[in-house]
Amino acid sequence: MSNENNHQQAQMLRGTAWLTASNFISRLLGAIYIIPWYIWMGTYAAKANGLFTMGYNIYAWFLLISTAGIPVAVAKQVAKYNTMREEEHSFALIRSFLGFMTGLGLVFALVLYLFSPWLADLSGVGKDLIPIMQSLAWAVLIFPSMSVIRGFFQGMNNLKPYAMSQIAEQVIRVIWMLLATFFIMKMGSGDYLSAVTQSTFAAFVGMVASFVVLIYFLAQEGLLKRVFETRDKINSKRLLVDTIKEAIPFILTGSAIQLFQILDQMTFIRSMTWFTNYSNEDLVVMFSYFS
């Protein structure tokens, strides 16, 4: 028992170290990439940053409601089943949730894509914001199912794949952003809207890389086959309903800050046009500074 406890503690420490490294690298990349990105955007930098921020505000809220706190619940359930020596229940659970979250991702991705013109109009920007939000819909499509796999590894107390997937996501995202922006602004058409659209589409490219890393670790550790081959039966429908009920308070509290940011976005340009003579372009630039 003592050896098992020591092993679990060591595994937890390693996992904490991996997550710390992942968070540090992600924040470092976030602080560094903006410098060349801003320079390459040239005179359009402030407006490009404003459009980027507006797209991401809505995108972040869609990510929040599309996952609905379920990955954390998955981690708790997997940890519970493993403690009870019922690992097959864990694999059956993941298979059920993967199907459910894939469907959820599809629904919310379609909503974001189809309602982008309406959301862009509410933001006061118009058609410039539409392709940016539509490019982010692709990331919404796969994020829910990817987050389930992350929750599975968290429940297995194996945080290395979780952290490695985060690192891969951020590294590939930043590489795509910078390469696309450089080629468009410095060697191509110079269309800053296309550069911003590719910069937001980079979220999807990064998630694909993250998904590949997670699948690799599942296969390497012999877990992928067990997820799809297990015949263990669980009451997944009831578990889904119970999980969503538990997640509702987290959705409400977690989305509060995001909703305030969206409210600012939806009212800033419209209210400023009522009381000032600034152009729409000037107001987008101001929004980028204030946000």
Predicted features along the sequence, with ranges:
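Hydrophobic alpha-helical transmembrane segments
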Residues: S165-L178, G188-Q220
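Alpha-helical transmembrane segments of multi-pass membrane proteins
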Residues: L110, L114, L122, G126-V148
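Membrane-interface junctions at transmembrane-helix termini in multi-pass inner-membrane proteins
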Residues: F143-S165
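N-terminal membrane topogenesis motif
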Residues: M1-I32, E88, A92, I234-G254
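Small-residue-rich midsections of specific transmembrane alpha-helices
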Residues: G55-Q77, L141, S291
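Alpha-helical transmembrane segments of multi-pass membrane transport and lipid-handling proteins
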Residues: R95-L119
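Interfacial/gating helices of multi-pass transporter permease domains
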Residues: Y38-A60, Y192, V196-T197, V241-K245, ...
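Transmembrane-helix boundary and interhelical linker motifs in polytopic inner-membrane proteins
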Residues: T67-F97, G155-K160
